[in-house]
Amino acid sequence: MRLWKSMAWGILLWHSQSGALCPAWPPARAAEEIARLQQQLADWNDIYWKQGVSAVDDSVYDQLSARLVQWQRCVGQDVSSTPVSPPLNGTTMHPVAHTGVRKLADRQAVEQWMRGRSELWVQPKVDGVAVTLVYQNGKLTRAISRGNGLQGEDWTPKIRLIPSIPQTTQGALANAVLQGEIFLQREGHIQQRMGGMNARSKVAGMLMRQDNASALNSLGIFIWAWPDGPANMPERLSQLAKAGFSLTKKYSLVVKDASEVERARQSWLTSALPFVTDGVVIRMAKEPASQYWRPGQGDWLAAWKYPPVAQVAQVSAIQFSVGKSGKITVVASLVPVILDDKRVQRVNIGSVKRWEAWDIAPGDQILVSLAGQGIPRLDEVVWRSRERSKPVPPDSHFNSLTCFYASATCQEQFISRLVWLGSRSALGLDGMGEASWRALHQTHRFEHIFSWLTLTSAQIANTPGFAKGKSEQIWRQFNLARRQSFTRWIMAMDIPLTQAALQASGDRSWEQLLMRTEQHWRQLPATGERRAGRVIDWRNNPQIKTLSRWLAAQHIPGFGS
């Protein structure tokens, strides 16, 4: 498939501001796009926290929230109103504020953050819903949703129905405030293979609904903070375990450097765990007194999240490719994203009909993942731009019998045919990829797919972009091609048969091939009636007949009299 580059449409220009990619929108459009995305996130947020229903995947919501912040910064807009927290319906004050956790982008950032800090531990970043548990006189008296970090919903009645959460405590925990994550209990969850499963939304839904007491049996608790607890981390973990919060001790490791953090992160990513995770949290054993905790100011802990299995990517252009068979395929060019250490900047959408059904235009946000063998795959459209400027696809008159000869409308299928004939399935012209064929055709204006046979060594050497060594190699390859078998030349002409079928036919000349009947072709391996008819159509095509005579004049084996 070759790109129909002349049909590319609506490319969005981008510039860098403070390290972020910014769309080059006029101010009015920027304001409109930001307002629309902000409203959509607010609507999803409201549904999520009021109804316990997720209208969009957790990862998609997080990435679009980050995209909104990026756009706001690009235009110098205040980002404080970004709807990343639940609507503030709850009025129950937290005894100790939830600080949140700073996100670190990569290992280098982890190394920098760890520098100068001591007594560090790493824990899995459990994916669920944050909560405050308040124990007084040995009894659970309050449970409060995270809310905005300072106050939240009173979840006490629901939390008391979760069997895995201790209702009574003793000793130092008899009067204590704990912060943790309510999670969906899993058996043998391998994050790398099973993904996030929208666990956060499922937990929120269970806690919001009024008619699902039995579902709460599937929830667990991971305590990640005991404000004003024992200063000694092993003692803190031991007391939590004795009180029934055993997971914290089991999944807390001492770390001295970023390498140890990375090993733990990779281990938890690939090992069977009892919960869904989305990264790791590194924390100092020594914490400030709880009276100093404030939302967004927890500098004694940081998170290193796993890369998402799917990335939200901005469509920068829509392009069309025409293959040697005439099939038109739509390709979306993307503002590059990283998936599994691979830089992804384009994704195949499929046919024109499929593209129209997806309704994708430049400026849209799409979810992209990697399919088998690391091939980018379109999963869904998660956000559509207000402006819907779409390109017009090329005419659909192309087929398997068009564009053996060059013309303005045949440019891309013609190039596809050149790439095919140079492949190992045909003439095996080593070193001849799409770029080389384009350079030769643009310079020497081929009449048809075999015009390169008439090029001299001097002409090849004078082709822009061809170094001396490369031009000599191509000259040798072109000369060697003259000695290729008749079967390979027929394959280069795109006969609609497999090489195995051609070998079984036993034809060694064009004259023999012309004498074959449709019945003969039907009997060949993997052929049948339909393909046999296509062979007859191919053989009788005027362009194919003309090419066969031209090859005969060039003394190509099998085409002479």
Curated annotation (Swiss-Prot):
Transmembrane segments: none annotated. Gene3D superfamilies: 5' to 3' exonuclease, C-terminal subdomain, DNA ligase/mRNA capping enzyme, Helix hairpin bin, Nucleic acid-binding proteins. Pfam families: DNA_ligase_aden, DNA_ligase_OB. It comes from the Bacteria. Keywords: DNA damage, DNA repair, DNA replication, Ligase, NAD. The active site is at K125 (n6-amp-lysine intermediate). This is DNA ligase B. The gene is ligB.
